[in-house]
Amino acid sequence: MQGRVSVWLSQHKLAHRPSGFDYQGIEIIQIKSEDWPSIAVALYIYGFNYLRSQCAYDVMPGGFLASVYHLTKLQDNADQPEEVCIKILVSRESPKIPSIFWVWKSADFQERESYDMSGIHYESHPRLKRILMPESWIGWPLRKDYVVPNFYELQDAY
């Protein structure tokens, strides 16, 4: 079943795949990485003027990485603002997604955190560098195949 945003994207011939709705009724749309800049601008023009959150996660060990954007259409006197969830899957061998910092400035720290923890490179981001981990850190801590360096398990003496 297509939601309002998916219908609108189809009318404007923007490539996407409807993925249903979450438990709150928020429409989920999956897109390809290369289509993200044009779809982001189109959604901003459509009225999604607020990036509520952005996150990244490892779908499964050895599988895809996902970057998820939650967009909200803020309007005056709106009790129930319209929301949409955009999901982008990328390969872990070359995890690259165009940054949407230039559309929603609030993506700055959120994309940096996703880069720092999951290793997704947000192309054309103005300050893409580690934000939580030291610059010397090796690897991406939130990937399911990550091995903590120099980890020693403490055992009970009893």
From Swiss-Prot:
InterPro entries reported for this sequence: NADH_DH_suC, NADH_quin_OxRdtase_su_C/D-like, NADH_UbQ_OxRdtase_30kDa_su
Subcellular location, record wording: Plastid, Chloroplast thylakoid membrane
Major subcellular site: plastid
Catalyzed reaction equations: a plastoquinone + NADH + (n+1) H(+)(in) = a plastoquinol + NAD(+) + n H(+)(out); a plastoquinone + NADPH + (n+1) H(+)(in) = a plastoquinol + NADP(+) + n H(+)(out)
GO biological process per UniProt: photosynthesis, light reaction
Span of the signal peptide: none
Source taxon at top rank: Eukaryota
A Gene Ontology molecular function term of the record: NADH dehydrogenase (ubiquinone) activity
Keywords in alphabetical order: Chloroplast, Membrane, NAD, NADP, Plastid, Plastoquinone, Quinone, Thylakoid, Translocase, Transport
A single Gene Ontology CC term: chloroplast thylakoid membrane
Function in brief: NDH shuttles electrons from NAD(P)H:plastoquinone, via FMN and iron-sulfur (Fe-S) centers, to quinones in the photosynthetic chain and possibly in a chloroplast respiratory chain. The immediate electron acceptor for the enzyme in this species is believed to be plastoquinone. Couples the redox reaction to proton translocation, and thus conserves the redox energy in a proton gradient.
Family: Belongs to the complex I 30 kDa subunit family.
PANTHER family with a match to the protein in the record: NADH DEHYDROGENASE [UBIQUINONE] IRON-SULFUR PROTEIN 3, MITOCHONDRIAL (PTHR10884:SF14), NADH DEHYDROGENASE UBIQUINONE IRON-SULFUR PROTEIN 3 (PTHR10884)
Protein's name in the database: NAD(P)H-quinone oxidoreductase subunit J, chloroplastic
Gene name, Swiss-Prot/TrEMBL: ndhJ
